[in-house]
Design a protein with these regions (language model features):
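Loop/helix patches that line or flank the sugar-binding groove of alpha-linked glycan CAZymes
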Residues: 6, 15-27, 32-183
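Helix N-cap / beta->alpha transition motif
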Residues: 1, 183-184
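Core domains of carbohydrate- and sulfate-ester-processing enzymes
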Residues: 1-13
Length: 184
């Protein structure tokens, strides 16, 4: 992982363009989060998901199968076993086929781990689309004022507020692989 300081740098460099950008964690050019080449486990995605989904008003994209932990570890078409999922080789992964069956009533198509991941994605998206602060609120990066706060690691933690009138949401993202308690 890179330092979470780059998140602050990124939004500051985008300035007024930020609401017009597309936020995403995966696409056909990038290695899948759950692949052996990147995050190795789809369950490690949530700090990145919450930061990408809740930080600003830009649109957010979930790429095919991401919500059930598609790993992209197939050697299909013109692509090697590279942790990516091609869109050009008319290929559908097992996870995407199982997700389709699950959505269409085959409740045994996905295993429990995939269902839990799907439900967590669903919950995050439902919260984001149902909260006025997330939909249209202002964003306040809290990292600069927590550089010396107890438990806050400036290279592994990212915290921000979304605020709109009486609705305020505090989001604290832990990008490390150990649990953390932080004072903000």
């Amino acid at each position: 992982w890179q330092s979470t300081r780059k998140i602050t740098w990124n939004w500051q460099s985008l300035g007024d363009l930020q609401p017009y950008m597309l936020n995403f964690l995966e696409n056909h050019d990038e290695q899948r989060f759950a692949s052996d080449f990147f995050g190795k486990d789809a369950g490690n995605v949530f700090a990145a998901l919450y930061a990408s989904l809740y930080f600003n008003r830009a649109s957010f994209m979930i790429y095919s199968g991401q919500e059930v932990g598609e790993r992209g570890m197939y050697q299909e078409g013109f692509s090697g076993k590279d942790g990516r999922s091609t869109i050009f080789d008319w290929y559908t992964s097992d996870k995407v086929r199982k997700l389709w069956r699950y959505i269409h009533g085959d409740m045994k198509a996905l295993d429990r781990k995939d269902v839990a991941l799907l439900e967590r994605y669903r919950s995050a998206l439902t919260q984001a689309t149902g909260n006025r602060a997330v939909i249209s609120g202002s964003t306040y990066d809290l990292c600069y004022c927590n550089l010396s706060s107890d438990g806050f690691c400036v290279d592994r933690h990212f915290a921000f507020l979304r605020d709109c009138g009486d609705d305020t949401v505090l989001v604290a993202c832990n990008f490390s692989n150990v649990d953390a308690e932080m004072e903000l």
